[in-house]
Amino acid sequence: NVSKLSFCDEFINKLPDKYETIIGENGVRLSGGEKQRLSIARAMLKKSSIILLDEATSSLDSETESKIQEALKVLTKDKTTIVIAHRLSTILNSNNIYIIDSGKIVGSGKHEELLKKSELYKHFYERQIQK
């Protein structure tokens, strides 16, 4: 079930009318994290061959992000996936990572390669992951 895979069922079942609840301006307002989880669920329902994730986990706490990362593995399996992220935890397992600084690609490679050859990437990694 897509709602379980995207962890939407956790908040949907707490809504007044559960899956029948009207959301949006004239209904119940969702948090940023709930909106992101709902967007991921919608993407799972579409059978797209290309997935674009733009800051897909930026409004999530670390625990929920970890759960969503598992859901994203299912969503992106066998699909071309482009991930735009400032959180390195979102991209650590990517096949190829591009570092963009001031609109220019200043580095590319896998995580381990970038740790060795990019001071900028290493700096972000040390600040975010190795606290």
Per-range role (PLM):
Residues 2-6, 18-119:
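ABC-family ATPase nucleotide-binding domain "signature/switch" substructure
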Residues 10-11:
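Short beta-strands and strand-coil junctions in structured, solvent-facing domains, enriched
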Residues 116-131:
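C-terminal boundary and immediately downstream tail of ABC-type ATPase nucleotide-binding domains
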